Amino acid sequence: MNKTFKLLIIDDNKEILAALCEFLSKKKYDITSANNGLEGLKYLEKEKQEFDVVITDLIMPDISGVALISIIKKRFPDTLVIAITGWGEHPEALATEAEADHVMEKPFELSKLEKSLKKLLSSKFDI
């Protein structure tokens, strides 16, 4: 990858957030993290569509990941979204309803997240 991609990672579970940030920063991504959807939304508004991908949990306090994804797709349509969740029997239905570009069920291997991330980015960028 020649371009450094900017990622916003949002999860209310601090351990998961830290693990995702540590792993992906070692892969040469530019990482911004948020502990909840409202904080993530503030970063999005501040950066004015500078994030290439948002990775967000679906179930969070204040604003759900589903609502957040809907907002992202309306305000920042070029931003790719990966939804992650460990909740519910049909998380894909929630994420599909919110128009996530990809869904991953927790727990997942970090290498699978990286593979999905690269696949999404290659569909949009020449990498």
Residue ranges and their predicted role:
Residues 11, 57:
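Active-site residues of response regulator receiver
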Residues 14-32:
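Two-component/phosphorelay signaling modules centered on CheY-like receiver
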Residues 49-55:
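Active-site beta3 strand of CheY-like receiver
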Residues 60:
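Receiver (REC) domain active-site loop signature in two-component systems and cognate sites
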Residues 67, 87-104, 115:
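Alpha4 helix (beta4-alpha4-beta5 surface) of REC/receiver domains from two-component response regulators
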Residues 108-119, 125:
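C-terminal output helix
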